[in-house]
Amino acid sequence: MSTARTENPVIMGLSSQNGQLRGPVKPSGGPGGGGTQTQQQMNQLKNANTINNGTQQQAQSMTTTIKPGDDWKKTLKLPPKDLRIKTSDVTSTKGNEFEDYCLKRELLMGIFEMGWEKPSPIQEESIPIALSGRDILARAKNGTGKSGAYLIPLLERLDLKKDNIQAMVIVPTRELALQVSQICIQVSKHMGGAKVMATTGGTNLRDDIMRLDDTVHVVIATPGRILDLIKKGVAKVEHVQMIVLDEADKLLSQDFVQIMEDIILTLPKNRQILLYSATFPLSVQKFMNSHLQKPYEINLMEELTLKGVTQYYAYVTERQKVHCLNTLFSRLQINQSIIFCNSSQRVELLAKKISQLGYSCFYIHAKMRQEHRNRVFHDFRNGLCRNLVCTDLFTRGIDIQAVNVVINFDFPKLAETYLHRIGRSGRFGHLGLAINLITYDDRFNLKSIEEQLGTEIKPIPSNIDKSLYVAEYHSEPVEDEKQ
């Protein structure tokens, strides 16, 4: 059987509202078992993640003393080598090494201990320019190493002798803020005192105020909360030298654009602005013209969809959707799956249906309490459940590398939404599967999205080749069909 199943699923955790409907998770190995490599990655994530009411605090500083002449690489605690196939989204590089950028040794140690062996294309393009202090407008696919592309130069440029906020990363969702802060903390752990803080709406404001009373070098935040802290005079940003807008298209949409304008006005005039996104609508161009000074433009988007994601559709009626999902669960070899619905109400209804079928699942949406969202995100990322039902809350930048299947239970209306949804699989050049349940009313949308993205969504075959989305079916890396 492809996913965890029990005859009597039970609700576990804080309450039924916390998004955790789960039975026991099937052991790794065998059909749907995930394999040893995925399990090792989950264990690494489990060790790395800490959540404290939405505020990430630097773990006890790790200062590594290395004597002159020591081979410092021998002291590293490297994760298991990732032997899964990778596509040219992340392998078509210029052959640079992280050492080529003259980074601090302590930062290099954190990079290598993250399992980052060589810079991806977006990192090769971005890191040297960001280190020079120039503004950047970067367009690259989700899941190709954007976080590292800005966090590495950001950390390199910190002056740890100073006790003020020197860099800010603004992201559109709380979950993404937690994820980016965890990465930042891990990469900087050998730097001996780099203080990283995440602050988001929905968490205790008093805790954030107390945290900012101590030294903080890097703030990773959602727009509304950081602007609130700036206006209260708690977050002092007069020494900020770099601000990053991750998922810039969302941050500069109608929901956030005025808040972002207000934040920029509080910063020094000589600050550096880095914009990263997969899509750049007119709102981003307008912001760029107003605030960026001769930006260096990076465009790694000759095609929009990830090379490693195979896309299918199944033509169904609304009443057939749950039965079709049940069939997919039984036939696919799922490491972890994310299932998208178009409303919070449908998320909860579907999660309940899935548990009634005997499969364990979590669910998450924007109307849940923040502590429940944090718990679901943390536990799913750590591999405690195989299936997650969610809204588009979970599309922006969330990186869970064990996810190899994305299912659009409800087909999205916008091409941009579709692009971000299917980008939850096939992360960092790995393989993934995107399956769309299409009703009669969705048929025009399907055609429109194919045309806008320049991609092909094929009818689902009776048997899906496991080599398209299961890493263990590749004994050695292969190139993209000779390109």
Curated annotation (Swiss-Prot):
MF (Gene Ontology): ATP binding; ATP hydrolysis activity; mRNA binding; RNA helicase activity
Catalytic activity, as annotated: ATP + H2O = ADP + phosphate + H(+)
Pfam families xrefs: DEAD, Helicase_C
The Helicase C-terminal domain, residue ranges: 308-468
Binding site for ATP: A140, K141, N142, G143, T144, G145, K146, S147
GO cellular component: a single term: nucleus
Subcellular location: Cytoplasm, P-body; Cytoplasm; Nucleus
EC number: 3.6.4.13
Annotated InterPro entries: DEAD/DEAH_box_helicase_dom, Helicase_ATP-bd, Helicase_C-like, P-loop_NTPase, RNA-helicase_DEAD-box_CS, RNA_helicase_DEAD_Q_motif
Uppermost EC category: hydrolase
Role this protein plays: Essential for the formation of P-bodies, cytosolic membrane-less ribonucleoprotein granules involved in RNA metabolism through the coordinated storage of mRNAs encoding regulatory functions. Plays a role in P-bodies to coordinate the storage of translationally inactive mRNAs in the cytoplasm and prevent their degradation.
UniProt record similarity statement: Belongs to the DEAD box helicase family. DDX6/DHH1 subfamily.
Name of the molecule in the record: Probable ATP-dependent RNA helicase DDX6
Species for this entry: Gallus gallus
Lineage: Eukaryota, Metazoa, Chordata, Craniata, Vertebrata
